[in-house]
């Protein structure tokens, strides 16, 4: 699977895990139906015990990201980054497969 995950994204995941004080956590990124355009990215800290055999697993900077097999096809050639702007911070997926985004930027279609 080809996906780029920036150092900033891994560093932020590590910070979130440190805040939870549970080294057994990983970030699950998934694509689910929802939003104005039909598909949305979801981010959830879950236990390493929840890693499935067909999950794609990325580990760097003492942080792990997992993507389920269904979501993988929607995330091919994507870049996952963590953005800090004036007054807000968020994970951002740049997806070359996205044909449209909703006005608020929270959902997309392929």
Swiss-Prot record:
A single Gene Ontology MF term assigned here is: iron ion binding
Q: What processes does the entry annotate via GO biological process terms?
A: iron-sulfur cluster assembly
User: Entry's InterPro entries?
Assistant: FeS_biogenesis (IPR000361), FeS_cluster_insertion (IPR016092), FeS_cluster_insertion_CS (IPR017870), HesB-like_dom_sf (IPR035903)
Say which family it is in: Belongs to the HesB/IscA family.
Protein name as it appears in the record = Uncharacterized protein RP063
């Amino acid at each position: 699977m080809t996906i780029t995950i920036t150092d900033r994204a891994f560093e932020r995941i590590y910070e979130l895990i440190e805040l939870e004080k549970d080294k057994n956590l990983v970030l699950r990124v998934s694509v689910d139906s929802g939003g104005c355009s039909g598909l949305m990215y979801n981010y959830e800290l879950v236990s390493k015990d929840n890693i499935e055999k067909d999950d794609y697993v990325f580990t760097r900077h003492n942080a792990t990201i997992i993507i389920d097999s269904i979501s993988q096809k929607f995330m091919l050639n994507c870049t996952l980054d963590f953005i800090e702007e004036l007054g807000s911070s968020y994970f951002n997926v740049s997806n070359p497969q996205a044909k449209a985004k909703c006005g608020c930027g929270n959902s997309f279609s392929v």
